[in-house]
């Protein structure tokens, strides 16, 4: 399996709440059915807010997390798929090209957002060790 991971940054003119609400409700609604129709394994979002960065990291690491170690992206979005061809079908679909892709201008920072792709391994799922 493979994963396409987006280190997302909100547009400068959006609040954290506006950004997280938009990607969770509007943008994901454009994309979910298309992903499912093309055998995509999973589509997940991790929402990183100033509260989670400050409060939760501080609680988990008891104030021992150096500030320079904290990456301040607003969200991490991950699409997991079995073959690259599965994901290419999504990107080549007319709905992706006319609705999903153009929607990025409504929320994504055009220069800060970053992308990575690699193979995907699952070691624990549903509270059970996966071998």
Swiss-Prot record:
GO terms for molecular function: monooxygenase activity. Pathway: Secondary metabolite biosynthesis. It holds the Pfam family EthD. The keyword Aminoacyl-tRNA synthetase does not apply. Residues 13-109 form the EthD domain. InterPro entries: Dimeric_a/b-barrel, EthD_dom. Keywords: Monooxygenase, Oxidoreductase. Its EC number is 1.-.-.-. Belongs to the tpcK family. Dehydratase; part of the gene cluster that mediates the biosynthesis of phenalenones such as herqueinone, compounds that have been reported to treat tumors, bacterial infections and/or mycoses, and rheumatic diseases. The non-reducing polyketide synthase phnA synthesizes the heptaketide backbone and cyclizes it into the angular, hemiketal-containing naphtho-gamma-pyrone prephenalenone. The product template (PT) domain of phnA catalyzes only the C4-C9 aldol condensation, which is unprecedented among known PT domains. This is Dehydratase phnD. The gene is phnD.
């Amino acid at each position: 399996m493979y994963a396409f991971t987006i280190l997302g940054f909100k547009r400068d003119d959006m609040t954290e709440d506006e950004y997280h609400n938009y990607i969770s409700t509007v943008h994901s609604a454009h994309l979910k059915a298309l992903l499912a129709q093309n055998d995509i394994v999973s589509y997940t979002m991790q929402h990183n807010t100033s509260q989670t960065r400050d409060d939760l990291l501080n609680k988990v690491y008891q104030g021992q997390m150096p500030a320079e170690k904290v990456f301040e992206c607003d969200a991490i979005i991950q699409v997991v798929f079995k073959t690259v061809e599965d994901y290419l079908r999504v990107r080549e679909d007319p709905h992706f090209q006319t609705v999903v892709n153009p929607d990025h201008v409504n929320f994504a920072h055009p220069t800060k957002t970053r992308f990575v792709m690699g193979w995907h391994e699952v070691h624990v799922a549903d509270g059970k060790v996966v071998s």
